[in-house]
Amino acid sequence: MEPAFWQQRWADNQIGFHQAQVNPYLQTYWPQLQLAPGSRVLVPLCGKSLDLAWLAGQGHRVLGVELSRRAVEDFFREHGLEAEVRQQGAFEVWRSGDVQLWCGDFFALRAEDVADCVGLYDRAAVIALPVQMRARYMQLLSGLLPTSCRGLVVTLDYDQSLLAGPPFSVRDEELRQGFAGWQVEQLEAVEVIEESPKFVQAGASSLLERVYRLSR
């Protein structure tokens, strides 16, 4: 999946993956990670998610990584924030208060960029990537993030043969294999097929949202 795919989705405002409210799983389960105030949290493929502002509101320093400059601009504009913009390596870094959004290719991140990220939040990143890319994504996270990191990951699980994706189905065993060096605990699995007409029309009988806590 090429970067141009996501750039075009944002250009055409085809952003059905964007949620108009803070994710309820984040609000319910994030406190269980027990991160100290001021902890830095990595949010990969963050878009213009409202979750970024929520995390900052919990006293965290937020590092979001997003390919689309349109998404980054929209986040700051929609929150009425003026951002300082500078170049850092392969990324254009936008900052306002405790929120930094790094505009660029996630796979260009280096260990020193996230060395102090002791929190990870993935609501729509791993499910946005096809199988080979998400294996690379999980491997990269495991290699970059410090051993003290704890995280929350939300996935979708459905019959992938019925829809091409994105969003892609990520089976429980695939996530555990991808984060093999982590302790992976499933916190909740919720059947949401009745709220998902696209999947019903494709013939899916089940669509599970799974919530995981990661630590190591």
Swiss-Prot record:
PROSITE patterns named in the record: SAM_MT_TPMT (PS51585)
Membrane spanning residue stretches: none
Annotated localization: Cytoplasm
Top EC category: transferase
Reaction(s) catalysed by this chain's protein: S-adenosyl-L-methionine + a thiopurine = S-adenosyl-L-homocysteine + a thiopurine S-methylether
GO molecular function: thiopurine S-methyltransferase activity
One protein family per Pfam: TPMT
EC number from the UniProt entry: 2.1.1.67
Main location (coarse class): cytoplasm
A Gene Ontology biological process term: response to metal ion
Top-level taxonomic group: Bacteria
Keywords, alphabetical: Cytoplasm, Methyltransferase, S-adenosyl-L-methionine, Transferase
Gene Ontology CC, one term: cytoplasm
Coiled coil (residue ranges): none
Binding site for S-adenosyl-L-methionine: 10, 45, 66, 123
UniProt record similarity statement: Belongs to the class I-like SAM-binding methyltransferase superfamily. TPMT family.
HAMAP family given in the database record: Thiopur_methtran
Listed NCBIfam families: PRK13255.1, TMPT_Se_Te
Protein name, per record: Thiopurine S-methyltransferase
Organism: Pseudomonas putida (strain ATCC 700007 / DSM 6899 / JCM 31910 / BCRC 17059 / LMG 24140 / F1)
Lineage: Bacteria, Pseudomonadati, Pseudomonadota, Gammaproteobacteria, Pseudomonadales
